[in-house]
UniProtKB/Swiss-Prot annotation:
This is Ulvan lyase. The record marks R191 as: Neutralizes the sugar carboxylate group at subsite +1. Pfam families: BNR_4. The active site is at H110, Y175. The lineage of its organism: Bacteria, Pseudomonadati, Bacteroidota, Flavobacteriia, Flavobacteriales. Keywords: Lyase, Metal-binding, Signal, Zinc.
Amino acid sequence: MIIKQYLLKISLCVLLLGCDSAKKEISKNENSKTEVDYFADNGFGNAVALVQHPSGVYHNGITYVAYQGPLEDPYVASYNHETKEWKGPFKAGISEMGKDPSRKKKIDNHGKPALLIDNAGYVHIAFGGHGGMRHHGENTLGNYSYGKNLHAVSKKPYDISEWETRDNVSLFGTYSQFIKMDNGDIYLFYRHGAHRSDWVYQKSMDNGVTFSEPVSFLKHKRRTNIEAEDSWYPWVSRGNADDIIVAFDYHICRDNVNAQDARGHIPERHNVYYMVFDTKNGQWKNVKNERLQMPLTKEMADEKTLVRSIPNDWTFQGITDVDPDGNPHVAVLVGPDINARRSGPKRLQHFRWDGQQWLKSNTANLPRGDGDLEVTSATEVSIYLENKTSNDVGEISRWDSFNGGESFQKSKVFLQRENSGFVISSLIDNPHPDARIIVAEKEEGTDFRKMYLLGDNGPIKRSKKEAQVLND
């Protein structure tokens, strides 16, 4: 009798274990079939931004995306629009930031990756820099902050699974911005150090194997009338033909202790400017086609490149695009000085060149939030915007103008999340309609972010098992 009871217990245990195993297998299979609308959950901090760009490139049927992941290292993923297949994310390099637990600022956020594909099919990223440090050597074009600017390249064309880091760009860079011209020339723009540094570019004519020495195009220098230095924040993009276009605002980089403002050094920016770099002849010019003496100083910028003087309110993050005739549109975030170390809430202001003068658009109906600008014709202009609604709903939307940018109306919502917010990338380079922009969802209580690839049909979905990278 005792033996029978013992055997019965064993049989029940085996049965229960088998059931439990079967349940786990069913759950595993269901998880692999369940789709979510994010492609990865390991975005970290401000995982993407407008300034480090492009964060994504569409090429030969595939969209490639890059973002900041755990420990501020760069990650790259891809989506095949024909097969609906995701690959990655793969860690593409190791940042010198994000590893020091003793730092007061745990997440630096300045070294997010910019991505480019060269004419041979190799994928490039620039990442990891916030101006470099003194032990890296002498910075002849500015001062120092943190991190180390790095350049990594895929080991095989169009294959993002393996990477190598090349020592061929300045390690003092930050805010990396990549541009590839039609002839294959690659330009890497960045600030050569911390706030009190020149903005420069390096050029490659051999698919990023080598780069020229840094060339300054925006000059930092000491002010003589106040205790501060001139500093800049440009946003660089492709124009028409051989042109590179630049929108930028001015940072008055006050001394920590100065006689003019008791707040000391604060993120105070003013004005918005525009200029063009003709890469065919190497000349810089303003919107009136007047040549500019480079590197550009504050005095010359005010005289020749000013879009709008904004002396009292604070500005942030200029963006620009041109219509098919080369007429530029410029937008910049503007918020009031509230006598604090930050400005009040900022809203996009939009300006357009009519061939004779800069005109200010009516954007009073735009919600507060950051975004990118797309000009598709002389009359059609779109703004891709992140914002929070009055009901605390994070939203990514598009606002369209059909009157050349005079006014904008909300036309499409790509994504909404309750009790969340988003950080947004610039528009993907040469975007597929289904994959125009990358966003990271900000949730309370965690520094990790769900990453979304958004297009005209909303977010591109992925299996839950593949998207939950942090559980691997």
